[in-house]
């Protein structure tokens, strides 16, 4: 019964996030998602744990001095079949850190498309659990994901790492996943919105391209729209749910440009949508329209440096892969109590005005394990 109630509340919360007025209230609207600051107030022991853990993530690896008795088993279910390289880099950096820690492991990887492959993800979860892994790395974006996760929590094993979400669910406070890990969608979107709205002069027409109706899109798109709503001379003229389909984003952009030739901005909720919108802008010679990316992966950085994108929130990507490996190391050392509930990595604003040397510096830091330097 409790599981059904939390599923219903999660569904209501997604609707509320879509209708949110103020971004600071989005995670509290139905008292389901707990923003990081609020969580730290409820759990005063967490700031010290998070600071200590972050120091471990930033520091060089400290290899185990004695080999473990057996390999750890890690099952990964990722919606990685998309243009963004976030998931691929997360996996590569986690594996690189595990090797540096001399922590032997077996890995089973299950990939899918975001939004549309929920049934496949459910089958992948069943297969993964039959393998009896020590760790399951998954995500939470839709109501079906919630059902899958509550099944794992009810089983009591494996240890569950929820990636790409840094706002714990209130319903799970007494039975939390092992770790929430990723980058704060609200924080990153605020960086983008502050820059875009100022460049637009806080006036004009804009459109929104939604990746899906899930949690991530609601956090990103809802935050941008809430910040834009503070300025009465800004008008959202179109809002498209694309189901994660770049072709839908491309066609929606073309249609909006035709119907609103004075369009000033496009807020894109993901890398795939940003690149699709960019294709439409180039084809119509409308590169004057402001366009953002989200995440700052390799494809976005290339588009930004080529003059296509105007701004992005760049994740220091590999930190979240390192964080997962370091959490496993602490468990191996029987120090699980030193693992915080949340790891939220750093995000940097990158714009068309950012000097190339600064972008190179951020790239080396963000991709330090997933994109090793060329020794040639």
Annotate the PLM regions.
Residues 29-70, 319-376:
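Hinge/cleft segment of the Venus flytrap/periplasmic-binding protein
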Residues 54-63, 73-93, 101, 110-119, ...:
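Extracytoplasmic "Venus flytrap"
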Residues 74-76, 94, 190-239, 328, ...:
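An alpha-beta-alpha
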Residues 99-117, 205-210, 225-247:
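Short beta-strand elements in bilobed, periplasmic/extracellular small-molecule ligand-binding domains
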Residues 106-130, 239-259, 274-275:
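Structural motif
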Residues 135-155, 224, 242-302:
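Hydrophobic alpha-helical
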Residues 143-144, 148-187, 298-305, 310:
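Flexible loop/hinge segments that line or gate small-molecule binding clefts
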Residues 179-204, 249-250, 297-300, 316-333:
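Hydrophobic alpha-helical segments within soluble ligand-binding/sensing domains
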